[in-house]
């Protein structure tokens, strides 16, 4: 007597392979950095062929960005809270950003990714579109609400959002000093003084 077996679901198998590739990429990015990361090493770690990787991603940069975004859960609806207290809301958001930058898993891989964008304009544009622009847009939406409530002046919201995040990223990227709660509070206070 033979038993009818269902053939494996290719979509499920592909999803398993895809997840293995993303995990291997994130792991290797943290271990060897962007420059030394190869598609061959990713394929070997994930237990797939290079052709499987290239079926889903056109190049290393696209794969690394997808792996990074999957790791940090960055591609979700982003909102900045609106409690009515702009200063508290901005402290919360900037504090969350600082916590992410201080997370060793995040920091190591983000620094590696930023190394990659130096020589890969396509990767730089994708990072901007998929990670930075959505976050800046959410911040600008909160600032726009503050403008409408009369809490801040009519200013260029692109500049205002970058004024908020710029000092933190500068200090983190160049390691010019610690990013403490006091530092975050000072950045928010100075930003609001400039905007009110």
Question: What are the functions of these language-model segments?
Answer:
Residues 1-45, 51, 56, 62:
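Basic, helix-initiating cap at the start of DNA-binding domains
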Residues 14, 125-136:
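Amphipathic, non-transmembrane alpha-helical scaffold segments
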Residues 77-110:
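Hydrophobic alpha-helical connector segments
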